[in-house]
Amino acid sequence: MENPFKYGVLVEDAFFTDRKAELEKIKRHLAGPNHLIMISPRRYGKSSLIAKALQELKRPAVVLNLQMAVSEVKLAAMIHKAIYRLHPMQKIKDTLQRLRIVPTLSFNPADGTFEATFAPNVDEQTVLEDAVDLLETLSDPENRTIVVLDEFQEVLGLGNGIDKRLRAQMQLQKNVNYVFLGSQESMMTAIFEQVKSPFYHFGLLMHLKKIPRDDFELFLTERLQTAAGDKTGDLVKAVLDKTGCHPYYTQQLASIVWERLVWMQDKSNVFEDAVAELVEEHDLDYERLWLSFNVTQRRILQGLAQNRKADEMTELATSTRYDSLAKLAKNGYVIRGRTFEIEDPFFKDWIAGRAG
């Protein structure tokens, strides 16, 4: 019997949860010569949603995670590798030979792909410009390539003025749709919404929200009904109350609940035992994370774990409090809705359980 919940990887097909309105909006927008910017906290399902859109659009696609790009040359090599996956090497050899800096190609028999490498001390800007130009040159005007740049805010750390150079190239391209994904809201907003930014209003801006509770209730009910029986309604409510409809944590907790319903003999405290299992399972990870915070950050996290609002923590100076919250939010440990809250509900339980 297969677990009907999936998390930690791209969620697709039967595991994909709702997002029908967002999916249709993305597909309509990318049907024209337009670009898309999507911002949301980590693990809200941006990558899964875009993967679903690409699957349904059936267009050539290049998907790059910019967290893996440690330099402009590395980003160029990533673009090359993705291009080689799309186009047979014999068809693009001549095009590659016309680049200002021709890469050295190597074949990886393990995955059947070609990779590009460049000589040491190569001109990084030229190499990257060539790679970005290739995206346009090799794209079919009748079947435009969609280029997804995940965690795009990371690009700012690769080189001075890289945003200006990329914008100058991309704005001239007619055969590519760019999709920019990012989880650091303040940085992404600065890149695409500040008037002086090179990427100001470069595409449609979408803020991906949590999945509506009604939709998640239906999704969970359909998948828990067989195992939970008349307990289904109470379990669904408990799961969503705990996770706040966060896509990742909802699937994670529901998965453990389902496992316990199906495989455990004692079903008297299924929900409580599932939560305890998740907290215990991540105990070492949470401890390492906790030790990485300074004292002020720990005090704030303890307050949030006790459901205190930020403005109630008057034992900390206002500037100190909000500077620390801003850093925690930037790194994804805290998210801001109506109030600040700890992003991981099970980390919240871990903190509360040790705060006494």
Segments and roles (model prediction):
Residues M1-L36, P41, M89, G356:
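A short, basic N-terminal segment
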Residues E2-N3, A276-G356:
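C-terminal leucine-rich, beta-strand-based interaction scaffolds used for sensing/assembly
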Residues G32-H35, I39-Y44, S48-T145:
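P-loop NTPase nucleotide-binding core
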Residues E56, R165, I256, K327-N331:
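Alpha-helical DNA-recognition elements
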Residues F118-E185, E193:
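Conserved Walker B catalytic segment
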Residues A190-D241, V262-Q265:
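Helix-loop-helix "sensor" segment of P-loop NTPases
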Residues V236, E259-H282:
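Conserved C-terminal helix/linker of AAA+ ATPases
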Residues V236-K242, Y248-V262, R299-Q302, A326:
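C-terminal helical "lid" of AAA+/P-loop NTPase domains
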